[in-house]
Amino acid sequence: MKAWVICLLVICAAVIAEPVESRNYIEYGAINKCAGPNPPPGCNPPGAEQKNPNPVNEYSRGCSKIHRCRRD
């Protein structure tokens, strides 16, 4: 009896289930954090894509005069 109920449920699930369409690619909006509703700090406001981003930190070799590193 239990086996018949399980078979009936499996058959009903197979008939009711709809095929799912898949995509071969991920849209850019899905991986762009700045395009979401709450962009993290550092994202440019909408419409400012043409502007150059401001550098966060200036470049430094990590070597100062006190360490007597080799000069270029």
UniProtKB/Swiss-Prot annotation:
Q: Which Pfam families match?
A: RALF
GO MF terms listed in the record are: hormone activity
- Please, which domain of life does this record's source organism belong to? Eukaryota
Keyword set, alphabetical order: Disulfide bond, Hormone, Secreted, Signal
BP GO annotations: calcium-mediated signaling; cell-cell signaling; regulation of growth
Q: Which family does it belong to?
A: Belongs to the plant rapid alkalinization factor (RALF) family.
| Purpose | Cell signaling peptide that may regulate plant stress, growth, and development. Mediates a rapid alkalinization of extracellular space by mediating a transient increase in the cytoplasmic Ca(2+) concentration leading to a calcium-dependent signaling events through a cell surface receptor and a concomitant activation of some intracellular mitogen-activated protein kinases.
Q: What is this protein called?
A: Protein RALF-like 13
